[in-house]
C-alpha cells in the first residue's frame, strides 16, 4: 500500500523517471540489500538520466537535422581531404566557448551536410539548442516573415539558437534583401554563438555571389575571422557506394 502511494505521489509530482526506477527496483530481489540513502540516490540518478534523455530528444526534434549523423561515425578512408585532427578539435567544446564559425566547402556528395549534421548532433548531446536550415528555406522563411510582420522576431530567434547550421549557402547570387538578412544573422551571432555553413562554392567566390562589395566585406570579415575552413574534395561518396 505504501509503495502504491509513493508511486502515485512521484507521478503526481511529474517525477516520471523516479517513478519508473522505483517500480523497477522494488521488483528486484536484491533491492532489500540497499540502504535507504543508496536506494534514494539510485532513483534520483535515474530521474536525472530520464530528464537528460527527454531534453536530448526534444533538442534533436527542434534541430530538424535531416540525417542522424555522428562525429564518431565519420569515414576517414574516403579520399576527400578531411583532416582527422580538425575533427578531433571539433569534438571538444572549445569552438563553442569561442563562438567559432565552421565553413564546409566542396563539390556535391563529399559529405558536407553529413558533417554539419554530425556537429549539430554533437551540440545537442552537449545540451545546446540547434537549428538546421537549407539556405533557400531560410530566405523563403524570412521573405514570408516580412510579409506577415514577424521578420524581427524571426531574426531574433535565429540569433539566439546556440548552433545555427546553414546548408547549401551561396548556390546562387544573393539579391538585396537576402544579403541584408544574411548580414543581420551573421552580425547578431558574431562573438555570441557559433554557426556552421556549407557551400558547394569555394570561399574565394563568395564575395562576388554576395554581390554588394560593402555588405560582402562585412559578412566575410565576420565569417572568416577565427573560423574553421574545411575544404572537402574528391568524388561523390554516393557514387562510390553504388
Regions found by a protein language model. Name each.
Residues 8, 24-28, 102-105, 205-206:
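Short hinge/gating elements
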Residues 15-18, 48-49, 95, 163, ...:
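Generic structural signal for secondary-structure transition and capping sites
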Residues 50, 55-91, 97:
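Clamp-loader machinery-focused feature within the broader ASCE/P-loop NTPase space
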Residues 1, 5, 13, 17, ...:
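Charged, alpha-helix-enriched surfaces in structured cytosolic catalytic cores
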Residues 82-160:
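Conserved P-loop
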Residues 1-8, 240-242:
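Intrinsically disordered, low-complexity and often Lys/Arg-enriched segments
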Residues 11, 16-67:
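Interdomain "pre-motor" coupling segment immediately N-terminal to P-loop NTPase/helicase cores
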Amino acid at each position: 500500500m505504501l509503495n502504491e502511494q509513493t508511486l502515485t505521489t512521484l507521478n503526481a509530482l511529474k517525477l516520471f523517471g523516479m517513478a519508473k526506477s522505483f517500480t523497477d527496483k522494488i521488483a528486484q530481489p536484491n533491492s532489500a540489500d540497499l540502504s535507504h540513502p543508496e536506494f534514494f540516490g539510485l532513483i534520483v540518478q535515474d530521474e536525472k538520466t530520464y530528464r537528460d534523455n527527454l531534453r536530448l530528444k526534444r533538442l534533436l526534434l527542434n534541430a530538424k537535422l535531416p540525417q542522424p549523423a555522428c562525429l564518431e561515425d565519420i569515414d576517414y578512408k574516403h579520399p576527400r581531404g578531411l583532416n582527422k585532427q580538425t575533427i578531433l578539435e571539433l569534438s571538444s567544446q572549445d569552438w563553442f566557448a569561442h563562438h567559432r564559425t565552421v565553413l564546409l566547402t566542396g563539390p556535391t556528395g563529399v559529405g558536407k551536410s553529413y558533417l554539419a549534421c554530425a556537429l549539430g548532433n554533437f551540440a545537442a548531446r552537449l545540451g545546446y539548442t540547434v537549428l538546421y536550415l537549407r539556405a533557400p528555406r531560410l530566405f523563403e522563411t524570412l521573405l514570408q516573415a516580412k510579409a506577415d510582420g514577424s521578420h524581427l522576431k524571426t531574426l531574433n530567434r535565429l540569433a539566439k539558437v546556440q548552433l545555427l547550421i546553414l546548408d547549401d549557402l551561396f548556390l546562387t547570387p544573393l539579391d538585396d534583401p537576402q544579403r541584408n538578412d544574411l548580414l543581420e544573422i551573421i552580425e547578431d551571432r558574431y562573438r555570441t554563438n557559433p554557426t556552421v555553413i556549407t557551400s558547394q562554392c569555394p570561399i574565394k567566390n563568395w564575395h562576388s555571389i554576395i554581390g554588394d562589395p560593402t555588405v560582402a566585406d562585412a559578412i566575410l570579415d565576420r565569417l572568416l575571422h577565427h573560423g574553421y575552413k574545411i575544404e572537402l574534395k574528391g568524388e561523390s561518396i554516393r557514387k562510390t557506394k553504388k
